[in-house]
């Protein structure tokens, strides 16, 4: 928006404060200089009506909303419909998709509205609920990614220490949601609605903001430092360490029955196929080596996909995490003159957070053959369903037309047969031989 940005962050994550506007607003943004109607018209023209570049932002949010919603729902349906896809890793992926669906439905629309209109239109209750759900979904996503990394680390690096099962995965998912709901309760407690212009509170809801209200200056700093460490930095460091060990295990290891160490190069692994001589592996040993190579290939694909998911998550959440710490902890952007740039940074970082929810299904589609097949099957069913409905209409139309034509033909044939029958009867009567020279009618 042109002019001063009333709230640099969306309500869901509450990444900036609107209370500082009174210190930085432009001189002409003073309601006492105008009558109420004129001032409200000015607000609509300068702040509420989307500018040209904000239409691009709206289009970007719509694309993310559609892709994130459809993609993550398809992920859940694919695992639910196919028993062979109900693995430990896929259970966690479904949980990640559920968190993405939650944040897409509940928080994305509110974020877009506030970023464009600079106003919280949704009341006091949703001012507490929506930010709470946002932080819960962030916590669920981070803890789920951490559980995936931990599960892969145990399965690949220490397979004998811990055995993952579907039941344990489901129990872990329940614990993740319970822990996330508990630790994010402070976010719901501190959120409050307020208005920038109290004199207009009875006339309009414009410039009502949903922001944190703390009892002192030290508490928000402590909270946001802990939030940054718990939901971003600490889990990210642990996951990076886990995947580094997984990488070393899968790409730099000695395969029994092969002649050399598997290098970091991503070359396809081939079992030894020379003729067996003294000391050469037996056929059963070769089969075991081939099975192990096949398992390593599958684990490489899975690890590669999960590493990319983690990398995309880190990139998408990095800008808003840094901006949040700079603003909440160090008090930056409170007296900046270039608020348009600050607004652009915050707005883009908000969009990146939601784009992460849309990116995950795309990653699964490109890097997982099973998910790709299920996505294709789902779209094929939709397309075939439309095609079948069109064919049914055409078939019914053809059947109706053919029925009418058949009925007309039958009636026409019946008339022709009737006429032919009459002609045959009359002809047969007229050609009877005359008796005693009498005419044909004399026999009656």
From Swiss-Prot:
Residues 76-88, 151-170, 244-304, 367-444 are cytoplasmic. Suvorexant binds at residue 324. GO terms for molecular function: neuropeptide receptor activity; orexin receptor activity; peptide hormone binding. PANTHER family: G PROTEIN-COUPLED RECEPTOR 15-LIKE, LEUCOKININ RECEPTOR-RELATED. The chain crosses the membrane at residues 55-75, 89-110, 128-150, 171-191, 223-243, 305-326, 343-366. SMART domains: 7TM_GPCR_Srsx (SM01381). Disulfide bonds join 127-210. Belongs to the G-protein coupled receptor 1 family. Glycans are attached at residues 14, 22, 202. This is Orexin receptor type 2. It comes from the Eukaryota. Residues 33-49 are annotated as: Required for response to orexin-A. Residues 1-10 have a biased composition (Basic and acidic residues). Nonselective, high-affinity receptor for both orexin-A and orexin-B neuropeptides. Triggers an increase in cytoplasmic Ca(2+) levels in response to orexin-A binding. Residues 1-54, 111-127, 192-222, 327-342 are extracellular. The record marks 44 as: Important for responses to orexin. It is found in: Cell membrane. Keywords: Cell membrane, Disulfide bond, G-protein coupled receptor, Glycoprotein, Membrane, Receptor, Transducer, Transmembrane, Transmembrane helix. One of its GO terms (biological process) is neuropeptide signaling pathway. It is a multi-pass membrane protein. Pfam families: 7tm_1, Orexin_rec2. Its main location: membrane.
């Amino acid at each position: 928006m042109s002019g001063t940005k009333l709230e640099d962050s969306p309500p869901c994550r509450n990444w900036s404060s609107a209370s500082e506007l009174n210190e930085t607003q432009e001189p002409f943004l003073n309601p006492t200089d105008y009558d109420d109607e004129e001032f409200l018209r000015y607000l609509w023209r300068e702040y509420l009506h989307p500018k040209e570049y904000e239409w691009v932002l709206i289009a970007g949010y719509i694309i993310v909303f559609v892709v994130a919603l459809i993609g993550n729902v398809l992920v859940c349906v694919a695992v639910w419909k196919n028993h062979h896809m109900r693995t430990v890793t896929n259970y966690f992926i479904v949980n990640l998709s559920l968190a993405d669906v939650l944040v897409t439905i509940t928080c994305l629309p509110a974020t877009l509205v506030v970023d464009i209109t600079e106003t919280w239109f949704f009341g006091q209750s949703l001012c507490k609920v929506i930010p709470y759900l946002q932080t819960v979904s962030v916590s669920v996503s981070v803890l789920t990614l951490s559980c995936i990394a931990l599960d892969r680390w145990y399965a690949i690096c220490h397979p004998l220490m811990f055995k993952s099962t579907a039941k344990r995965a489901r129990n872990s998912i329940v614990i993740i949601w319970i822990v996330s709901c508990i630790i994010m309760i402070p976010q719901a407690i501190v959120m409050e609605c307020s208005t920038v212009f109290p004199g207009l509170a009875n006339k309009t809801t414009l410039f009502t903001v949903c922001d944190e209200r703390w009892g002192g200056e030290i508490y928000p700093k402590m909270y946001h430092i802990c939030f940054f460490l718990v939901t971003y930095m600490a889990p990210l460091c642990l996951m990076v360490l886990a995947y580094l060990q997984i990488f070393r295990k899968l790409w730099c290891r000695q395969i029994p029955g092969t002649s050399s160490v598997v290098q970091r190069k991503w070359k396809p692994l081939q079992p030894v196929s020379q003729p067996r001589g003294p000391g050469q592996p037996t056929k059963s040993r070769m089969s075991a080596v081939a099975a192990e190579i096949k398992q390593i290939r599958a684990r490489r694909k899975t690890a590669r996909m999960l590493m990319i998911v983690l990398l995309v998550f880190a990139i998408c959440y990095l800008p808003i995490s840094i901006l949040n710490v700079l603003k909440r902890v160090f008090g930056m952007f409170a007296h900046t003159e270039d608020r348009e740039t600050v607004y652009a940074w915050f707005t883009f970082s908000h969009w990146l957070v939601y784009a992460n929810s849309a990116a995950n299904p795309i990653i699964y589609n490109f890097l997982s053959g099973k998910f790709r097949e299920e996505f294709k099957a789902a779209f094929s069913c939709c397309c075939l369903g439309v095609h079948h409905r069109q064919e049914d209409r055409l078939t019914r139309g053809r059947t109706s037309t053919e029925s009418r034509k058949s009925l007309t033909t039958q009636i026409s044939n019946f008339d022709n047969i009737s006429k032919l029958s009459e002609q045959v009867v009359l002809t047969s009567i007229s050609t009877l031989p005359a008796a005693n020279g009498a005419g044909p009618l004399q026999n009656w």
